[in-house]
């Protein structure tokens, strides 16, 4: 049975047990203020090399300053996670970043991703945000997932996040 709950700090490293594998056939690029879809094939076997080491400390810091971490479980197995940053960003400081949203490969298209996204959106609104900011992996499936939920290209990409992830598609959505 699939259940959900907030994660504990000591469970952050369990995020890396999520099966991030994916076959990608199309990638979006941001060019001249528009999205351009290009055919490119990648077989992603899991988390990129070095990503777990790089991001564990970033996620722990996010947790320690009040970030919201929510996991979906199949019995005891973590199969999906959403992380909402607690620091406000944006020109008007009215956006919260959806720092992470991943669902294990076998559980995609099951509704788990939609549920995690919706819970994060509600949590952002409860915390006083007007919008959620998303730096999305540029794969067609990821970008379309967010577009189906009303996300659109960020009017003004966050300079810090854009510098960290210039290849990502920077999106925002009203909460």
Positions of PLM-derived features:
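Conserved catalytic-core motifs of GNAT/GCN5-like acyltransferases
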Residues: 133, 147, 152-168
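Acetyl-CoA-dependent GNAT
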Residues: 9, 17-94, 99, 104, ...
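Conserved acetyl-CoA-binding loop-helix of GNAT-fold acetyltransferases
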Residues: 100-103, 109-122, 147-148
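Conserved GNAT acetyl-CoA-binding A-motif
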Residues: 124-137
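Short polar/acidic secondary-structure junctions
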Residues: 87-89, 137, 159
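Short glycine/proline-centered loop/turn elements that form peptide/ligand docking sites
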Residues: 113, 117, 139-142, 159-165
């Amino acid at each position: 049975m699939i259940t959900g709950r907030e994660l504990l700090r000591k469970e952050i490293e369990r995020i890396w047990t999520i099966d991030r594998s994916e076959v990608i056939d199309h990638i979006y690029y941001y060019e001249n203020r528009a999205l351009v879809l290009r055919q490119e094939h990648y077989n992603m076997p899991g988390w990129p090399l070095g990503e777990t080491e790089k991001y564990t400390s970033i996620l722990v810091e996010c947790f320690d300053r009040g970030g919201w971490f929510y996991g979906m479980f199949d019995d005891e197995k973590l199969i999906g996670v959403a992380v909402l940053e607690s620091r406000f960003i944006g020109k008007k400081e009215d956006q919260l970043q959806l720092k992470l949203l991943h669902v294990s490969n076998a559980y995609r298209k099951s509704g788990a991703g939609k549920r995690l996204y919706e819970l994060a959106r509600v949590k952002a609104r409860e915390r006083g945000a007007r919008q959620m900011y998303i730096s999305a992996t540029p794969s067609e499936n990821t970008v379309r997932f967010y577009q189906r939920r009303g996300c659109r290209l960020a009017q003004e990409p966050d300079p810090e996040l854009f510098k960290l992830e210039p290849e990502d598609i920077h999106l925002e959505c009203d909460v």
